[in-house]
């Protein structure tokens, strides 16, 4: 529609006055026409994500703003700081999508991600390793789920029973043997049965 705006109104003011972009509209390539010609291509993400207002151009009388349709919409869910749908354009990659999502949270599993893609007749799954994130080009409709790291430890031991300082300890250079561990827990108490101690070791399948 046609809008009357203040003298210093910008492209963003005009979009706001128009009620924003609808579900199929693009935020990545809003075109400002001036004197019948394309004057500037505006990427709203530059302002939203980075505070870059170089594209927030002051409008002139008779300017036309054209909002086309989006090129790609992808969904980033799980352990990222801003899980939601994002619009991508051109050859933007998984790394760029994760950047828009604010990056990983502290408990995110980062070694690889599974990307679900809509094929012609069924879904396809891609396992993308972290060194491939900058090269993996996203497609329209892609969905990424960032899982959490496993709630278990790779270097923890637990000491229970008749010792002075039972608890959980980290396996390290200073605690590498059972004797080291007994030194840290300050040895057995006076009421401890010294003829036997039981060592449980948890396997990768969580059995003992």
Question: Where is each model-derived feature located?
Answer:
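Ser/Thr/Pro/Gly-biased, low-complexity, turn-/loop-rich segments
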Residues: 1-208
